[in-house]
Amino acid sequence: MPVSIVIGSQWGDEGKGKIVDLLSPDVDIVARYQGGANAGHTIVWDEEGETEEFVLHLVPSGIFHEGVTCVIGNGVVLDPKAILEEIEKIESLGIDVEGRLKISHNAHLIMPYHKAIEAAQEEDRASASDDDEIGTTGRGIGPAYTDKFARTGIRVVDLLDEDVLRRKLRRSIEEKNAILRDVYDAEALDVDRIVEEYVEFDQKIDDYVTDTSAYLSRALDDGARVLAEGAQGSLLDVDFGSYPYVTSSHPTAGGCCTGLGVSPTEIDRVLGIAKAYCTRVGNGPFPTELDGEVGQALREKGGEFGATTGRPRRCGWLDLVALRYTCMVNGFNELALTKLDILSGIDELKVCTEYRYDGKTTRRFPSEPQNLTRVEPQYETLPGWEADISAVRHVDDLPRAAQDYLAFIENYLDVEIGLVSNGPRRSQIITDVQPMAAA
């Protein structure tokens, strides 16, 4: 198992953190390949009978497992203040981070002006039209990636040379202040304060910085097992999602190679993570969205509030048209289905199997947002189940209707479900699922 990838197959918040946490004891390295502190991976574990919850935004979830090294790759945009706060919080739990966290010297940095510009942009969009507002997390992710691809960004390696950092920072801040003042009529930032603050980060972050691509290459040559994790979900990919209501990077499988510097030939497992229903945060088309009591019930029972922003998530029925699309884009050879327990108590479950558009039905997912807003989901209705399944550990102990639900998904997608999560805790997992399609 050279490299396995864990990928969100919907609009994010699928439960990737729990699955990475589950798989981490069997690997040597867990590596994050894109995104920034706009993603929140929630880990819930049991220690001596007590349940504890921890939300990670940047450090891979493998940090909770002794002997596992964690990597933040070059594809990540890094907020130095956020990463240092997260490290401090992890260490306060008695978990050793020293020597176990490696940060790419080529990762780009998120600066205060990125957050200021993002806030100004969102305010400007909102004043123009509610439909134009993308609904970002306010963490400066988009503007940081903008600078990266404009080749004006500041990278982690720049923190290590004070003269270079001061020169680049002053030039960038003066440029961004002109945009804030003249375009958005917003308050300018204090150049000297930001320069001094970021010069200090060098002393605190230096021990973690390395060429992570070279590190991973050597580790793979030595037979290391690597688990790569993305942030957000495939339907938020900047190229393959519902543009412009997307993130600014590539959560899809291809992002792993460019975000870590590993060869595609090293990848042998692509594991898609999907909820048993759908959720979405922020604006953008959502064909199976439920506005009534069922949607509210899913939100409350599933705790569907953003781990990063706290915003309520929009909830809807499982969309197999969309999931089939992300299976195609990523080449999943296995799925993990999460939050199956949340569906207990619903008499009838609807699953979207086709879209109706312009008088015709199709199984093709239209990535163009203007078309996606006009499709009408066509549903298959499946029987629900009443039983609380959160204590089930073997697939044969699930209610027949729950087993049929899993089999229906497998048959439609032609992808096996290898894992089923039926609760937030580490122990709430069913691993003997295959082959459900034959059930």
Curated annotation (Swiss-Prot):
Binding of GTP, residues: 12-18, 40-42, 313, 339-341, 421-423
Q: Which residues bind Mg(2+)?
A: 13, 40
Q: What is the lineage of its organism?
A: Bacteria, Pseudomonadati, Rhodothermota, Rhodothermia, Rhodothermales
GO BP of this protein: 'de novo' AMP biosynthetic process; IMP metabolic process
The name under which this protein is listed is Adenylosuccinate synthetase
Task: Name the gene for this chain.
Answer: purA
Which residues participate in substrate binding? 307-313
Please state the Enzyme Commission number of this protein. Answer: 6.3.4.4
- Active site positions, chain numbering: 13 (proton acceptor), 41 (proton donor)
Q: What is its main location?
A: cytoplasm
What is a single cellular component term in the Gene Ontology annotation?
cytoplasm
Molecular function GO terms recorded = adenylosuccinate synthase activity; GTP binding; magnesium ion binding
Report keywords, A-Z. Answer: Cytoplasm, GTP-binding, Ligase, Magnesium, Metal-binding, Nucleotide-binding, Purine biosynthesis
Q: Where in the cell is it found?
A: Cytoplasm
HAMAP family referenced in this protein's UniProt entry, alphabetically: Adenylosucc_synth
Q: How does it assemble?
A: Homodimer.
Per its UniProt record, the required cofactor names are:
Mg(2+)
Its EC top class is: ligase
Q: Which PANTHER family match?
A: ADENYLOSUCCINATE SYNTHETASE (PTHR11846:SF0)
